[in-house]
Regions:
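Conserved nucleotide-sugar donor-interacting segment of glycosyltransferase catalytic cores
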Residues: 1-45
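Membrane-proximal helix-turn-helix segments that form the acceptor-binding/catalytic region
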Residues: 8, 39-80, 93-95, 99-100
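A short beta-strand/loop micro-motif in the catalytic core of glycosyltransferases
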Residues: 15-19, 73-85, 102-104
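Short aromatic-enriched loop/helix-cap "lid" or pocket-rim segments at secondary-structure transitions
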Residues: 26-31, 36-37, 94, 114-117, ...
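Conserved donor-binding/catalytic core segment of Leloir-type glycosyltransferases
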Residues: 81, 125-143, 149-153
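A structural signal for the hydrophobic beta-strands that form the central parallel beta-sheet
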Residues: 82, 103, 134-135, 163
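Acidic anion/phosphate-binding donor-loop and adjacent secondary structure
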Residues: 89-92, 108-123
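Glycosyltransferase donor-sugar binding loop
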Residues: 108, 135-138, 160-168
Length: 168
């Protein structure tokens, strides 16, 4: 209903912020680990990511893809925003490629979040180390946990990896 209204009103300026790939695939919010690029033409046939977030037991992936393409394309006066160059590049390879895409990185309000004195390096005995910080709500392969584990095996003793978030 929303996109039908937006198409009927080209005089309205529209800005749509994408935070993942769901808008231009038949199902997937993220497809990189499945190494699937069907979304660049048409999601059809077997979906290697069907049991991943967002999980589905239904096989309406091709019809979802076609429905999204029909609904989301052809909206005049719309700009897409992504929080990364990577996502912008993915959008530019999708059926949304005809829209202007701008990158606006996620920001930090420095009036709320500011550097404060801390003894955290002393507490964990890493005062002399260079810290590589990783932050994720939940750590898993998709968020790069395996990469951090591999990195930790190859770093010199001058470095310490600090990960913040939850993991199994």
């Amino acid at each position: 209903i929303l996109f039908k209204y937006l198409k009927a009103h080209p005089e309205i300026k529209k800005i749509w912020t994408l935070h993942d790939c769901w808008a231009f695939t038949g199902h997937c919010a993220y497809y990189t680990y499945a190494k699937c690029d069907k979304w660049q033409t048409c999601c059809n046939g077997y979906c290697p990511n069907k049991k991943e977030y967002p999980k589905t037991i239904f096989s309406k992936i091709e019809s979802n893809f076609n429905r999204k393409r029909k609904i989301f394309c052809g909206v005049e006066n719309m700009i897409l925003i992504t929080p990364s160059k990577w996502l912008k590049n993915e959008v530019n390879h999708s059926f949304l490629r005809n829209y202007e895409v701008m990158v606006i990185n996620n920001g930090v309000d420095t009036k709320v979040f500011k550097s404060t004195p801390s003894n955290i390096k002393q507490k964990y005995n890493i005062e002399e180390k260079k810290v590589i910080l990783g932050v994720a709500s939940v750590w898993d392969k998709r968020k790069g946990l395996d990469t951090f584990i591999d990195l930790s095996k190859n770093l010199s003793s001058d470095y310490k990896i600090v990960l913040i978030g939850l993991s199994n």
